[in-house]
Each structure stands twice: as structure tokens, then as C-alpha cells.
Curated annotation (Swiss-Prot):
Descriptive protein name: GMP synthase [glutamine-hydrolyzing]
Residues annotated as domain Glutamine amidotransferase type-1: 10-200
Enzymatic reactions: XMP + L-glutamine + ATP + H2O = GMP + L-glutamate + AMP + diphosphate + 2 H(+)
Amino-acid positions noted as binding ATP in the UniProt annotation, renumbered to this chain: S228, G229, G230, V231, D232, S233, S234
Active site: C87, H174, E176
NCBIfam families registered for this protein in UniProt: guaA_Cterm, guaA_Nterm, PRK00074.1
SUPFAM superfamilies: Adenine nucleotide alpha hydrolases-like, Class I glutamine amidotransferase-like, GMP synthetase C-terminal dimerisation domain
EC number assigned by the record: 6.3.5.2
Pfam families registered for this protein in UniProt: GATase, GMP_synt_C, NAD_synthase
Single GO cellular component term: cytosol
InterPro entries (UniProt xref): Class_I_gatase-like (IPR029062), GATASE (IPR017926), GMP_synth_C (IPR001674), GMP_synth_GATase (IPR004739), GMP_synthase (IPR022955), GMPS_ATP_PPase_dom (IPR025777), NAD/GMP_synthase (IPR022310), Rossmann-like_a/b/a_fold (IPR014729)
Amino acid sequence: MIILKKQHDTIIVLDFGSQYNQLIARRIREFGVYSELHPHTITAEEIKAMNPKGIIFSGGPNSVYGEGALHCDEKIFELGLPIFGICYGMQLMTQQFGGKVERANHREYGKAVLKVENESKLYANLPEEQVVWMSHGDLVTGLPEGFVVDATSESCPIAGMSNEAKNLYGVQFHPEVRHSEHGNDLIKNFVFGVCGCSEGWNMENFIEVELEKIRETVGDKKVLCALSGGVDSSVVAVLIHKAIGDQLTCIFVDHGLLRKGEAEGVMKTFSEGFHMNVIKVDARDRFMDKLKGVEDPEQKRKIIGNEFIYVFDDEASKLQGMDFLAQGTLYTDIVESGTATAQTIKSHHNVGGLPEDMQFKLIEPLNTLFKDEVRVLGSELGIPDEIVWRQPFPGPGLGIRVLGEITEEKLEIVRESDAILREEIIKAGLDREIWQYFTALPGMRSVGVMGDERTYDYTVGIRAVTSIDGMTADWARIPWDVLEKISVRIVNEVKHVNRIVYDVTSKPPATIEWE
């Protein structure tokens, strides 16, 4: 995003494989400063061209002295930019400047008490003792020349170090993790106190810049957008429509695997509310015919993905003069793939590969944003809360929440039970606290008694998790009285259900979805 980089101070984060690397960039953006995550292989020249105010080295699972250790372009240290090494990043800096890194006697994982020994700029106005989050198997045992010890812990004599003359800093713990009680303040001290950044990254500025960028890119040509009703595609559609109006056409495919009222809600919001040109395709019978008798989850995903492509292709071929395809690719998608997205699309991010003869120029206005930023953007654009805060929903829809073969009866059970769950969670005021919640049909039946009669009906599973980004998740502690209301309502209001179970498994070992 070239325009933004020129207008805003930027902090570059180099990725050395930490599970927390995205959190670092997100924390910095929360401060109102733009930040990007880049592979550790980026060159010093490439960084110089971005004109950042500072660099952060992330943590990682490797040992700096081990086979396959990840390194960076040594010329990065010659750029004269402030550098902040976190965990592996500190060890890499130590090795680079002639210090010593060794394996610890035991791996340290969890909370530790940090004692500040030297109040460098990194620890300005922070308490002398604070709880931090450790996750490492190696230690810095010898400081490089010119460095001093900033902080220690019981198991880590050099938990923080600095060479303030060269603006080089390192910590053995993870300030980006919320368990580090003053971690945000420490990162702020680096961003503002050391690098001298100014706030300026916000959604209002983003919208202004992105609207102009879309207009310049598209000109008088036309754009096609696959609208699912999910957060990402909804925000993309509204943003582009705000920029170019009727030059945008959306295709909404109703595959019959949507949640209760979802298809009607999409049309009402976008066709009537935003006055957008939306083509609705009723393809329920087409999808159900293809899924008949299929039980394997991967095969179901493949069939749904492929059929979506064929339906989209059929509709797109009826439209003339479509030059661009709008896609809701997020920054996390680019980071996790490790490569930038190609300029000409042959595969759609959300639905699988489009036919090879369908060539579009790609527009990805969200590809510098994280999910939480997309929600903020959606609110700024005036999209209703029920869409902006909509639960994450998989592309195959309810097709992977019905375990085994999909039938209309099973879909109806999941659709109705899920609607009750959502209604009660919202009533209880828990909808913003729980990251994701839904019902699933595991395909098992059990004996029950209803109205003095024996029943042999389906079991419905409830899944609710708390998470920051979906990479890890914990099962949500929904109050018992709320669970009871949900259970009673589902059993009484949804036909062919006589038992409710609650999934109390975290991710890992389980995934959030059941299929």
C-alpha cells in the first residue's frame, strides 16, 4: 500500500517463525502507527525503500546455533535504524554482535517476574518488577560488546539488554502477549520513545486513501464481487460501491447451506439498504444434488467449493465487460501464505480455483488489514452491527456443521438450533465476549423420554470459544443458566432433537469447527 507508507510512520516486523508474530504488528497498529510483517529473508535495500522508523525481530522456535537456524540480511544492522529483538530476535542480535547464546538447563514457559536493572528507554516509566510471559529454550549467557543488562528474572539472568548508543534493544520474554502485564507499554516505549513515531494510522484516513486508490485503479471500468454476506466480502463490496457506485456488480450465491434468515438479510442490507446491484442465484437444489450420499468432510468441502465456482462462472459469463474481481483477502491471508497475491486471478481466495479462462485484474482493498480492523472499517462505512460483528462462518457453510451426509432435515435442525443459540447469546450480552459460537449435528441419535413416550432422536452439539485471532482458542465459560435456557429451547422448539451436549475442548488439540 504505497500511498499509506508515504503518509504514515511505519514499523517493520521481521518474521522468524513465532506463533505471536502477527500480534506484534497488531499491537503497534492499535497504537495508531502502521506496521507490516515481512519474512526474515527481506533485504536491507527493500527495507530501506520502505523508509520505516524502526524494525522488530520476532521470536521463533529455532536455536540460533542450530542447523536450519533463520538469519537476516546482515546489512540490516548497518541501516542505522532502531532494532528491537524479541526472544529469538534478541538471541540473533546477540550472535550477530559477538555475544553468547546457549541452551537453558530447562525450557522456560509461562509467567515470570521481571526485575528491571537498568532503566533504558525501553523501560521508561515502567515498574521495577512486572509479570512477563516467557517461552524459550535458549538463553543469552554472554553480552555482546557495548550492551548492558536491562532486566533479569529468576531463571534468566539476561532477560533484557540494550546498546542505547546504537538504538539496539532485546528482551527474552514476549511483550506482545497479554500475559505480559506491561508489554504494551514496553512496545509503546520502543515505537514512540526510541523510534520517534507519531500516531496517524486510523480507519478514517484509510478509507480516504483507499477510495481514491480504487477510483484511480478502476477508472470507468467494471468490477465484479462475490458477496457472501460475511464480514470480509460485505466490507469490500460497500467500500468499492462507495468509490465507484454502479460500476460494481455483486453475485450472491445461495447454496442452501446458510444460516436462518441469512439470504434474506443479505439482499435486504445490500440491495435495498445500500442500493447495490446484487444478483441473487438460488442454487440450493444444484448443491444438494451434488452432495447426496457424500459423508467425507473433505469431499464435501471440495464439492461445495467446486460447485460454487461453476455457479459463479455461469453467472459471470452472462455479464459483459467485467475487468476486475474484488476479493476480501486480509493481511493474515497474505502473511500466512508467505507470498504476495498475484495480480491476475486464477483462484478465488474464499472459494477455491476459478476456471483458468476467467482472467480478472484483482482488487484487494483489505489486504493490509487484520480482522479486527476490518470490523472497525465496516462500522465506519455504516454497515449494520449484525453483519460487522457476524460470527466467522466457513465457506462450505452449514455443510460442515452437519457431520456425515447432508439432508434437508439435518440442515433444518442445525439452522434452527443455531438461531436459538445466537438469540440467547445476544440476549445474555455475551455476543461480543465470545469469539465464535454455533451448533453442530454430530450425526448420532440417543434414547430420550418426551411426553411419557420413548424417543430416539438427534443430539445437537454446542461449540463456543474465546480467542483473539482463531489460531488458538479456549472453550467459552457460558453461565449455566444461559446454557440451560439454550438447551431447553432447542429440545422444545426444534423437531427430532432430544439431547444437547457442550464442547469443552480447546484448540489445540481440537479445531474450532467439527469438520
